[in-house]
Amino acid sequence: MSAPSDIVARVRERALQERGELPARVSEWEVAAARRELGFPLPRLLVRLYQEVANGGFGPEYLLLPLVGEGRTAVAEYGPCEYWPHGVLPILDWGCGMYAAVDCLDPDAPVLLFEPNAGPEDWAKAWFTDSPSLTLWLNSWLDGTGWWEEEVMMAEDAPEPPPWPDATSRLAS
């Protein structure tokens, strides 16, 4: 697994290769304002991505949402409700109502998958653990091994993300 400083450099390099020009980076002031608005701290690696790579516009498939700014942002998309737990920040819209989100209250910053399309009566059943940490999730993108990669999805032994074990308790709080 890559060290945090190494992974940020690898993400920036890949983002520049794929996207060319990237959006502006986020300032300390903008991060502080986002924290205040959200009401919880952001994982250090996530902050570094927004400050050292770009304010969104990079990453797997549909690209990370900007943290702040005009239009759709992670901060604007966040809002605890009956199906969205406090402290879980959406970072990528997969389409069809699905999101990748980071559990900002867990020190490991796991990346969760919100997949509501089965129409669960129990919203906890719409939450899955995509990756045990943001670092591992980014590595799966960098290495081409994420579930969203066509080769991985089409494989007979394609992995299914496990249910998020904290979903029920976190949705109740």
Briefly describe each language-model feature range.
Residues 1-99, 162, 166-173:
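A surface-exposed partner-binding patch
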Residues 53-162:
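Long, low-complexity, intrinsically disordered segments enriched in glycines and aromatic residues
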